[in-house]
Design a protein with these regions (language model features):
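Conserved glycine-rich cofactor-binding loop
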Residues: 12-14
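Conserved Rossmann-fold SDR core element
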Residues: 81, 160, 170-184, 226-233
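Short C-terminal tail/terminal secondary-structure segment
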Residues: 144, 227-251
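Catalytic loop of short-chain dehydrogenase/reductase
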Residues: 133-171, 183-184, 237-239
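Conserved glycine-rich Rossmann-like NAD(P)H-binding loop of the short-chain dehydrogenase/reductase
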Residues: 28-43
């Protein structure tokens, strides 16, 4: 059974938007959380509603607990019950323990770990008996640690652990799984050449196809024998000794 009543954080752009498109279809309802991407969210809403979906946009800053709590309340009001939560949105800034500061720490931990925890808790209150899923978008770096992106890495390793422990807590009525992507879309700090060097340094020497991530989401939803698993979908980057920090490549 496919998901029918879905929440996607960071669903207006990049990986989140691609997942929304993958899961959309006739009678599918999706709440898309955005923060700074309203225009892109509106365009996506129009596109997906042409496929027969009902799309609801909500602005929320995942660093603010009051904003996070209103997402599930909004979704419940619009859709009744819920059956799928995709914790996709994240803050991704570079810091190191040597220049630790509370602002960066709080931004990452609040948006990338605390928000998914709150959303998962609230989501669990509004599901029916059946095929219910939480899918956390993590990062391959949880399998291949480096000292870079200090606060981000800690937030994602926390989300990795939460995927495992919440799968135990929410079973059998909610399955919880995660996807740990590698180099998929160039970020704003990277040049095209840096991004190319990054994915060419993976064992498969290829950029992660965003459709592969979407297909993995679909796989987790449909396969009712899987919970508590995190799939490294990274062209083998987590196996690699040629990580960006070794090669001197910007991330």
């Amino acid at each position: 059974m496919d998901a029918q009543k879905i929440i996607i954080t960071g669903g207006a752009t990049r990986i989140g938007a691609a997942i929304a498109e993958q899961l959309s279809g006739f009678k599918v309802q999706i709440v898309i959380q955005y923060n700074m991407s309203r225009a892109k969210g509106e365009l996506l809403k129009k596109k997906l509603e042409k496929k027969g979906s009902r799309i609801y946009l909500i602005k929320a800053d995942l660093r603010k607990e009051k904003d996070v709590k209103k997402i599930v309340k909004f979704a419940k009001t619009k859709m009744g019950y819920l059956d799928c939560l995709i914790n996709n949105a994240s803050v991704f800034d570079n810091d190191k323990i040597e220049n630790f500061n509370s602002k960066s720490w709080n931004n990452h931990l609040d948006a990338n770990l605390k928000a998914p925890a709150i959303l998962s808790k609230e989501f669990s209150k509004h599901v029916m008996k059946g095929n219910n899923n939480i899918i956390n978008i993590i990062d391959q770096r949880v399998f291949k640690l480096t000292p870079h992106f200090f606060s981000y890495t800690l937030s994602k390793t926390g989300l990795y652990t939460m995927t495992k422990t919440s799968a135990m807590s929410f079973a059998p009525n909610i399955r919880v799984n995660g996807i740990a992507p590698g180099p998929t879309i160039k970020n704003k700090r990277q040049s095209n050449s840096h991004f190319k060097k990054q994915y060419l340094a993976t064992p498969l020497r290829r950029q992660v196809n965003i459709n592969d991530i979407c297909n993995a989401v679909d796989f987790f939803i449909k396969n009712r024998s899987i919970t508590g698993q995190v799939l490294a979908l990274d062209s083998g980057q987590s196996l690699n000794w040629q990580t960006p920090d070794i090669l001197g490549i910007k991330e």
